[in-house]
């Protein structure tokens, strides 16, 4: 009984050590903001700027000028000529 308990403890320690090596925070990526002391993440924002596209084509108009997709209505995209309807 004592031998199997010792083996289980050793196995658990080995698993903790092995799994602990996978969870590593890379240095320099999370820093503390000097002004307010909050933690900040210096990695790029991975949130996509793409908008979901509906299969239903809207007949509503679009804004005329844009710099990026978020400047246009939800059913429009930003092109080199300005906002334009998706598939239209």
UniProtKB/Swiss-Prot annotation:
Its main location: secreted. Keywords: Amidation, Cleavage on pair of basic residues, Disulfide bond, Gamma-carboxyglutamic acid, Neurotoxin, Secreted, Signal, Toxin. The modification 4-carboxyglutamate is found at residues 68, 73. Expressed by the venom duct. All different gamma-carboxyalted forms are mostly present in part 2, part 3 and part 4 of the venom duct. They are also found in part 1 (proximal part near the venom bulb) and part 5, but in lower quantity. The keyword Signal applies. Belongs to the conotoxin P superfamily. This is Conotoxin tx9a.
